[in-house]
């Protein structure tokens, strides 16, 4: 009997899926906005929310836990010093998915994933 899985497999092997999600989360924190298919972005949103919640308390333990997922030291430092202080008072909902419509080639649902507070615009 088939049972429901708690996440979307995205038609990939587990190692490919993990690498895809890690790279997309790093791109989100680097550029503060990414565009992709809605299915991928809804999975990336889950991981990004967990990482931002973990980064709100800056401790050695939390840095090590987040660094298991984010291997880029520059992005890790940006998450803990610039992104997470913006969301100190917010309990959740740090990231939003905005639907764009369908892609021309294969009619896949496209969307934008962005951080909610846009105070990081000064680069």
From Swiss-Prot:
Residue runs in coiled coils: none
Keywords of the record: Ribonucleoprotein, Ribosomal protein
Matching Pfam families: Ribosomal_L17
UniProt xrefs under InterPro entries: Ribosomal_bL17, Ribosomal_bL17_sf
Ribonucleoprotein listed as a keyword: yes
SUPFAM superfamilies the record matches: Prokaryotic ribosomal protein L17
Presence of keyword Ribosomal protein: yes
Gene3D superfamilies: Ribosomal protein L17
GO CC annotation terms, alphabetical: cytosolic large ribosomal subunit
GO molecular function: structural constituent of ribosome
Domain of life of the source: Bacteria
BP GO annotations: translation
Subunit structure: Part of the 50S ribosomal subunit. Contacts protein L32.
Family, similarity comment: Belongs to the bacterial ribosomal protein bL17 family.
NCBIfam families: L17
The protein, known as: Large ribosomal subunit protein bL17
Species of provenance: Borrelia hermsii (strain HS1 / DAH)
């Amino acid at each position: 009997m088939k049972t429901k899985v708690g996440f979307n497999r995205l038609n990939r092997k587990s190692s490919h899926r993990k690498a895809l999600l890690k790279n997309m989360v790093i791109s989100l924190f680097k550029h503060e906005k990414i565009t992709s298919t809605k299915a991928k972005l809804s999975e990336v949103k889950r991981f990004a929310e967990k990482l931002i919640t973990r980064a709100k308390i800056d401790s050695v333990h939390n840095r090590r836990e987040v660094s298991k997922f984010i291997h880029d030291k520059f992005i890790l430092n940006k998450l803990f010093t610039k992104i997470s202080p913006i969301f100190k008072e917010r309990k959740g909902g740090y990231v939003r998915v905005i639907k764009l419509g369908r892609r021309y080639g294969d009619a896949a649902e496209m969307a934008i994933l962005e951080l909610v507070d846009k105070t990081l615009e000064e680069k």
